[in-house]
Amino acid sequence: MSTPDNRSVNFFSLFRRGQHYAKTWPMEKRLAPVFVENRVIRMTRYAIRFMPPIAVFTLCWQIALGGQLGPAVATALFALSLPMQGMWWLGKRSVTPLPPSILNWFYEVRGKLQEAGQALSPVEGKPDYQALADTLKRAFKQLDKTFLDDL
């Protein structure tokens, strides 16, 4: 669930972790006021889908209209970097340890899952946002939607 040393993460593995975190995080509207992940994941998916064609279009358009090549390439590279920035942020967030207020909430959700008879693996080290995403995804699948009301 979580790595013992969250700070020793390879730069390129952050992108993989970001993809995994985006797939794991439950996209529930009730979590949106508390966590920024819903907006970041939605915008990153949007950027993955639309930024490459926009980059190609702006590059071709500026070249066709006799624009300079330098600014055209810079604009295209910026547009192409937006999805990567989103994935990098998500990967960095996934290995960030939970703050104390969310940590208490994390243990309460785990307790509700255990009360419901779900077998959970023990948490290794300090829980991070990836562990929270795994727990929330499982809670939304296994528990009724009212489990958030009690917390």
UniProtKB/Swiss-Prot annotation:
It comes from Citrobacter koseri (strain ATCC BAA-895 / CDC 4225-83 / SGSC4696). It is found in: Cell inner membrane. This is UPF0208 membrane protein CKO_00500. The chain crosses the membrane at residues 46-65, 69-91. It comes from the Bacteria. Belongs to the UPF0208 family. GO terms for cellular component: plasma membrane. Keywords: Cell inner membrane, Cell membrane, Membrane, Transmembrane, Transmembrane helix. Disulfide bonds: none annotated. It is a multi-pass membrane protein. InterPro entries: UPF0208.
